[in-house]
Structure formats: C-alpha cells, structure tokens
A protein has these predicted regions:
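Compositionally biased, low-complexity flexible segments
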Residues: 1-27
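Non-catalytic alpha-helical scaffolds and adjoining flexible linkers that form interface surfaces
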Residues: 29-277
C-alpha cells in the first residue's frame, strides 16, 4: 500500500511507489473437520525469540493470514536448512503447519532480503526496527488478515533499503500511513474538532490539527511548513518531502512520534533509538 493513499485510492503518478508482488504458493489444505492443517503464505519477519536449545518463535506479518507466531524448529543450529532466512526485515515465502498453540514453519524461502542493506546503516536499522514494532502493535490480533498493513510495510522496507530518501522521512511516512490505515489518521488541513480551515495548533489527544477556538490546553504551534510536510508524507508527495528543511523535519518527527505513542497503548520502545535531529 506504499503507493496507495490511506483510503486505498491511487494518487497521481507523483510520489506513487509501486508495490512488488510475489505470487504465493498453493492455498491451505483443509482437514476433514474443516480446520486448516497446512498452509502457505508470504510475510515479513517482525521479530524472533529463543525457544529451548535450538528453536525460535518467529513473528511474521503475512499477506493473507495477518499476524502469525510460529515455531521454527532447529533454526538456531548451524546446519539448519532455513534458519538464516527467518531473520527480522526478511520478506519470505513460508509453509506452515497449524499447531495446537503455535504454528510450525516447515519451509521458508527468501523473496527479498531487505535486511542486508538495512543493517549496514544505523539510521536505516533503527528506522526499520521501529517500523516492525509498529506493524506488530498496530495489527495486534493474530490471524486477522491485514493486507493493507502488509503491503505498506513491504513498500516501506524496500524504499528504506534503496536509500533514495532520508530514513527519518521514510519512517514518518510509514507511521502516518499505518495509523491512517488503522483508522487514526491525524487531521492536518482542517480542525480535528470543528472542521474549520487553517488550523493553528496541533494536539495529539484532540486528533491532530486544531483551530484557535478549539485549541485545548497542551497543544503546540507547528510551523505551516510542518503541516505541509506531514501532509506530503501521508499523501506520498516525495518531491515536497525531500525539499523540506531540517527544522521542519525535526518538528514533524516529534509530532508524529507523540501522536503514535498516544494512540498505541504501550507505545513504541524502539523509537527512542531513532535519530530525530
């Protein structure tokens, strides 16, 4: 969805980024009792955690199934067939078996190793880490299809790896669009409370931009250019975003981070590592 507007409509050619689509394998196999036993999907590895001496629990955001937590058996062994493919930032095609508590990964093939370019640069790495954490918390419910969030994450990781735009801008664009897809798009061009034009302030707890009359206590006064930058990032206007100044980028990043932390219950811990100035 990196090349789509938050409401799913395609914008003009300006700023649109194509989404690379890989055909997934055959659909799920169904047991006699109607439950899925074996299924195939493509996904992005969000995080991993150790399990026992040789296994890992792998959390993925997948194209068709949504958020999936599955066990990769023996993937920590040096002779594992696909252990290296199940690392964070990797775009993989996986086959899984439905278990009683956690699914089990039986096959994994790399589609795009985004991590190779991302981990080589600190700014890209911290931005991508914040993206993965955000994706997991925004989707939240396991096995609830979230195609738009999946496509958005894939496009953001690809763009980050290409290095065309500053990592901070790519991160803020992803955060704004992810929130918009989840239903939390901030008001930018009009007052979040009365709908009036030419807002003067920004209040995270009020839903974004606010006018002078509706402005609540605790709101801040961003520069008009900062509102413009946020709108450009949300809408995919990269020429305008790339032309922004350091002052407005810093102000934008602060507002986006505050807005995100307000709407996600536990916040995003990895945002503290991101260079914001």
């Amino acid at each position: 969805l990196w090349g789509l507007s938050p409401r799913g409509r395609r914008p003009g050619r300006r700023g649109a980024l194509r989404v690379w689509v890989h055909p997934v394998g055959p659909g799920p196999r169904i047991r006699d009792n109607g439950k899925v036993s074996l299924y195939r999907d493509e996904g992005v590895v969000l995080r991993t955690q150790k399990l026992g001496e040789a296994d890992r629990i792998v959390t993925l955001l997948t194209r068709r199934t949504g958020l999936v937590r599955a066990v990769g058996k023996g993937v920590r062994r040096t002779k594992s067939r696909f252990g290296a493919r199940l690392e964070p930032f990797s775009h993989v095609d996986v086959q899984l078996y439905t278990g009683r508590t956690l699914d089990v990964i039986t096959q994994a093939e790399t589609l795009r190793p985004y991590g190779e370019r991302i981990v080589a640069d600190y700014a890209r790495y911290t931005a991508a880490t914040a993206m993965l954490e955000t994706a997991e918390k925004v989707v939240a419910v396991e096995k609830d299809p979230a195609l738009r969030q999946f496509l958005l994450l894939i496009g953001a990781l690809r763009t980050l790896g290409e290095g065309v735009h500053e990592p901070r801008l790519v991160l803020d664009a992803y955060l704004l669009r992810s929130l918009a897809v989840a239903g939390y798009a901030p008001a930018l061009g009009e007052c979040a409370r009365c709908g009036g034009a030419e807002p003067r302030g920004f209040a995270v707890h009020a839903g974004g931009a606010v006018c002078g009359v509706c402005r609540p206590h605790g709101s801040v006064n961003p520069a008009p250019e900062t509102f413009g930058l946020m709108a450009a990032l949300l809408g995919g206007d990269w020429p305008a975003a790339d032309a922004s100044t350091e002052r407005h980028r810093s102000e934008c990043s602060g507002l986006v981070a505050a807005y995100l932390q307000w709407h996600l219950e536990n916040g995003i811990r990895s945002l503290r590592l991101v260079e914001r100035s």
